[in-house]
Amino acid sequence: MWQRIQTLYLGLAAAIVFAMFFCTFATIIGPDGTKITIVYSEKIAYLSLMIMMFIAQVAAAASFKAFFLQARVAVIAGLLAIGFQIWLGIDILRNLDGMSFNVTALFPLVAAALDFMAAQRSMVDEMTLQAVKSTRKGRRKRQK
């Protein structure tokens, strides 16, 4: 399962999404100097999207024997990650004043890039497999 590079990409993307469950999204510094941290899992919308992204990552990594299915699920996971990144970007632009945002806000973008690279590698593997099957089939017909 872990011999193919696309499975490693998907595993790394799943680890990035899993890490977001425990990371802070932003810090609010009050007028009296108190710090309030906001974790991704505090917002229900963020939590539900992160759960969906993590399930899609694991499902894509688990479907390593079906290359087309793996590529499709990886693309879906990447689109979910891009949607989540857009949502985070809108929230950041809305609350730019008074909040300090963490670098983990870019994790969905990294996960999406890994998902799309995994989908591309999965399709390359499937095309290579189809070409080898086609070549072998042609040789067998000529030998008869």
Task: Indicate residue ranges for each PLM-predicted region.
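Interfacial helix-start motif at the membrane-water boundary
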Residues: 37-55
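Hydrophobic transmembrane helix segments
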Residues: 15-43
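Cytosolic juxtamembrane helix and N-cap/initiation of the first transmembrane helix
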Residues: 1-20
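Juxtamembrane helix-break-helix junctions at the cytosolic face
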Residues: 57-71
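Cytosolic juxtamembrane helix at the C-terminal end of the final transmembrane segment
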Residues: 118-140
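Hydrophobic alpha-helical membrane segments
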Residues: 72-89
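Membrane-helix boundary connector in multi-pass membrane proteins
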Residues: 89-102
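Alpha-helical membrane-associated segments of multi-pass integral membrane proteins
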Residues: 99-124
